[in-house]
Amino acid sequence: MEDSLDTRLYPEPSLSQVGSWRVSSLPSGSPQLPSPTGPSLETARAHILALGPQQLLAQDEEGDTLLHLFAARGLRWAAYAAAEVLQMYRQLDIREHKGKTPLLVAAAANQPLIVEDLLSLGAEPNATDHQGRSVLHVAATYGLPGVLSAVFKSGIQVDLEARDFEGLTPLHTAVLALNAAMLPASVCPRMQNSQARDRLTCVQMLLQMGASHTSQEIKSNKTILHLAVQAANPTLVQLLLGLPRGDLRAFVNMKAHGNTALHMAAALPPGPPQEAIVRHLLAAGADPTLRNLENEQPVHLLRPGPGPEGLRQLLKRSRTAPPGLSS
């Protein structure tokens, strides 16, 4: 694009500048900006207004406007000034070639302040890209608790049960992302631990925001408990079984194409994670007498050999013990 704004005028805020800004203290209207060592919001507004609406609405070969580019680079002052103009032309949700609005671009770039600004200016909070992913899906996919916090603090209603084109809610997406971060990988352990921590935080935040833990993904009817068990993640299983709402026994015995979480746990490779998960499920009221579509009980899905023999005896005892007495 010709005569585009020189984005070098709008450096990304330093951590100290970001830290001095507080969402909770904002009134409606323009954000209260710290005193940065660089251009102010008024300076950004002057440059944006000088460009005129034609250049602000122009899209490059990938469909990006200047607002998309500012959001992607974390150029907050320029993004806010550009968004004000696009708001006047009802183009705040203009899409690039993958269907991403500036809000979705800001979320993917992990720019929670810009996410907060765009929402305050009227960006559509439930907009989705060409994969059906909302701002919550994006934050869940990449493990971005700051973005989730920005959405939550905005006070704007968002659809926590929205489905992407894979049939996943943001909570399903967050659990799958957490499971992936905990798999053995070539990345350094410190980076892997950081990813897992952020993604676990996203799971917890979505639950606190009111996401339904009983929602089933469309393709195979799995709940987040099934997904956690399938990934042999005893820590997450224990967290989900400790949720303080709903009928725990009904939740733990929900079926995904005929299989309960206990069926899936019994089919895991033998080892400490499997044993911990089976014990957690039984303690929460999992019914070892339920059968799947192949008429199998969980005990029938244990792998042969001496490894799972202790679990075999436990499941057999639990089939005849009164509820709550299995151990």
Swiss-Prot record:
ANK repeats lie at residues 62-97, 98-127, 131-160, 166-215, 220-250, 257-290. Specifically expressed in spleen and at low levels in thymus. Expressed in a population of antigen-presenting dendritic cells which may act as regulators of systemic inflammatory response. GO terms for cellular component: nucleus. The keyword Acetylation does not apply. Its main location: nucleus. Disruption phenotype: Mice are highly sensitive to LPS-induced endotoxin shock and susceptible to intestinal inflammation caused by exposure to microflora. They display no overt T-cell selection phenotype but an impaired proliferation of T-cells. Thymocytes and T-cells seem to produce less IL-2 and IFNG. Induction: Up-regulated in thymocytes upon TCR-triggered cell death (at protein level). Up-regulated by IL-10 or LPS. One of its GO terms (biological process) is negative regulation of canonical NF-kappaB signal transduction. Residues 14-23 have a biased composition (Polar residues). Pfam families: Ank_2. Residues 1-40, 293-327 are annotated as: Disordered. InterPro entries: Ankyrin_rpt, Ankyrin_rpt-contain_sf. Keywords: ANK repeat, Inflammatory response, Nucleus, Repeat. Interacts with NFKB1, RELA and RELB; in the nucleus. Regulates the expression of IL-2, IL-6, and other cytokines through regulation on NF-kappa-B activity. Functions in the regulation of inflammatory responses. Involved in the induction of T helper 17 cells (Th17) differentiation upon recognition of antigen by T cell antigen receptor (TCR). According to PubMed:11931770, it may also regulate TCR-induced negative selection of thymocytes. This is NF-kappa-B inhibitor delta. The gene is Nfkbid.
